A protein has these predicted regions:
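Kelch-like beta-propeller repeat domains
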Residues: 11-309
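Secretory targeting and sorting signals
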Residues: 1-10
Length: 309
């Protein structure tokens, strides 16, 4: 279902996924929004779809346990919205999603209070499901793409802290939604792979804060949409896990090796079950990347896993 340093080192060839056993967890869901909130030092999850309806609950994870936050007001129930942390304003930005309608509202999460605030902007991207939100190498949150119910988008926007401003790079990736995207903090490069489009985009793009570059990788994952990507400081690489591919959900783990401009599949001693639409984030409290939720076929998941290199 779809709704620092420039030096690099080679990532190891193997790693292990370990399932965590927190005392409580959010209910099962897929196509949730999830990111690390640097202000509160916690991972935040919002919304998703549980097989019967859209969700609008907020949860945080401190490296040990999940906690439900009864926030009011709150964004409306939705799936396939996206979030990213704005280090300038120290707020989490949430945009878009789908709940029977395509959504174009902007919400800010203050994890220190904690509360949500709806921002009534003068300008905004189109109302879309599956936009790609990411911290840009210049320190702002950028948005690319999404699907508005008729067309896949290829516009790019930047959050100023109070409004959206459109960016016009000389080249942009092909239009798409629900791609896996993450920023490599060790290289200052954004990495984007896959997604949904009129023609399945089996390609890798990188962005340095000014220019998008289509990479000619010698090896790469299968085409996936709703895959989960995050930067892992332990590997100094962007990790890509899972995703849907032609109706078959995946559970492979890949890393983008920037110096070689190539993907490498990691041999994992254990792996979460296949899934699409899962949340992923690097959790400094654990010191590892974690994955939560998603769906495997019609099975909706609420398990939490950490990746140990």
């Amino acid at each position: 279902m779809v709704f620092g340093s420039t030096a690099t080192t080679a990532a190891p060839d193997s790693a292990g996924w370990v399932q965590l056993s927190p005392s409580s967890s959010p209910p099962a869901r897929s196509y949730l929004a999830m990111t690390y909130d640097g202000a509160s030092g916690k991972v935040i999850v919002f919304g998703g779809y549980d097989g019967t309806g859209y969700l609008n609950d907020t949860w945080t994870f401190d490296g040990i346990s999940w906690t439900h936050v009864a926030a009011s007001p709150s964004p409306s129930a939705r799936a396939n919205a996206q979030m990213a942390y704005d280090s300038v304003t120290q707020k989490v930005v949430l945009f878009g999603g789908y709940n029977g309608n395509y959504l174009g509202d902007t919400w800010l999460w203050d994890g220190t209070t904690p509360h949500w605030t709806l921002v009534r902007t003068t300008h905004r991207p189109a109302a879309v499901t599956g936009p790609m939100l990411f911290p840009d190498p210049n320190g702002r949150v950028d948005l690319f793409g999404g699907f508005d119910g008729h067309f896949y988008q290829l516009t790019m926007w930047q959050w100023t802290g109070s409004d959206w401003t459109q960016l016009v790079p000389s080249m942009v990736p092909y239009a798409r939604s629900s791609a896996a995207v993450a920023t490599n903090n060790s290289t200052g490069q954004v990495v984007m792979f896959g997604g949904l489009a009129d023609v399945n985009p089996v390609n890798t793009w990188t962005y340095d804060g000014a220019t998008w570059t289509l990479q000619s990788a010698l090896s790469q994952p299968l085409w996936v949409y709703a895959g989960s990507a995050a930067f892992d400081p332990n590997l100094r690489a962007v990790v890509l896990f899972g995703g849907g591919s032609g109706g078959i959900d995946q559970n492979s783990t890949w890393v983008w090796y920037q110096r070689g401009r190539n993907w490498r599949q990691m041999a994992t001693t254990q792996s979460p079950p296949p899934r699409e639409g899962a949340g992923i984030a690097y959790d400094p409290a654990l010191g590892h990347v974690i994955v939560f939720g998603g769906q495997n076929g019609d099975a909706y998941l609420n398990d939490t896993w950490e990746l140990i290199p």
